[in-house]
Amino acid sequence: EGKTLTEVLPVVENLLAHSKLYIGLSTLDNLVKGGRISRAKGVVSSFLNMRVVMELKNAELIPVIKGRGNKTFLKWFEGFKEELKQTPNLKRIGISYAGETEQLKLFRDELQELFPEVMITFFHTTPVISTHTGSGAFAIMYYSE
């Protein structure tokens, strides 16, 4: 409050340097509609029941894992928990979702059990984001010092 841009900018840069964001998509239909992927890729991924998890890195979404069905998310989550265990000074975890929450509540509960001292925020994403991602999408982000 009352800070100048030159005072705030280093704080924001530090926050970005110590944060990670992963996005999981259950369907690529909305990415096809938005022109982000081709119609052919969308049809194939829908037919094969593809799921994808991506990491936001330097303003780009980098695929981390692709697979068929919800087992893809479970496999990714196991590796994600290990990543968090190796992260020093973990401060906060956020889980955002569009639509279905059952699996994500289990993720949240497992993370809270592993990291009881870390605040975990669990919230529905904004309509703008859910329009682009479609139902069943989620984001998990964390911040460390």
Task: Name every feature range the model reports, one short phrase each.
Residues E1-T133, A137-E145:
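Mixed-charge interfacial surface used for oligomerization/domain docking
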